[in-house]
């Protein structure tokens, strides 16, 4: 089961009172409901999630009396294991939709104030919208992403504003004949899941994200340390080669001034030391050790260039 499916499974197990249940149903009906007009008017809510189908059925039966509701199941084809579910409301369709603030003709997209006039109702509406057409990437993946899809531009903007009320800065893009409201920042995805009541899967998201970020941080630190070690080793090896070259050219390192002689011999004796470590051995600073090495490098350059030099003036 995917992470998104786990989130929806948790949401379908939440208990809600009547006002919040109707706000959730309103979103589900708006986003996934299909009305059939005529004498035998019906409305069917489609989903590929059995738990969501049961949720819709239960909320309808709990909030409306004397309604006829049935759940239908359809297989995509005989080779497929995927099924789709429909929750079919067979009577009192107009009464139920009116109570939920849903226009069966889709001519009035506005949501009545009574559906969203409390904070918990707005949370429930967002929950219904996510159950109907939402998805979220697993926190194991590199790209954090949560989205809700709708074919109605007005509803997309309503959802965006509703999310902003909860401190969730969502964006909207056009996609395949509809609109996607999405969040990319991991901490805001966590906040969204908390807002709609997915507490357990939210905590799981946070745990996985923190472990993943920690591993990445450790890897970055390790890579940086390895790079520094390699850089130090390369520099030390180059200095050893310079000192050996100078010793061969002048005949004896003892001919060097004391400060340069000390650093040269220390480097040959401790080829793996960093400049800071060499400085500690000679009781000088890292910058002092670096200054002396630069003088040895200058001497090497003069020898290579055939320039006359005076060891006593180095």
UniProtKB/Swiss-Prot annotation:
It comes from the Bacteria. One of its GO terms (molecular function) is DNA binding. Keywords: Cell cycle, Cell division, DNA-binding. Residues 274-305 bind DNA. InterPro entries: Homing_endonucl (IPR027434), Intein_endonuc_central (IPR004042), Sporu_reg_WhiA_N_dom (IPR018478), Sporulation_regulator_WhiA (IPR003802), Sporulation_regulator_WhiA_C (IPR023054), WhiA_LAGLIDADG_dom (IPR039518). Involved in cell division and chromosome segregation. This is Probable cell division protein WhiA. It comes from Leuconostoc citreum (strain KM20). The gene is whiA.
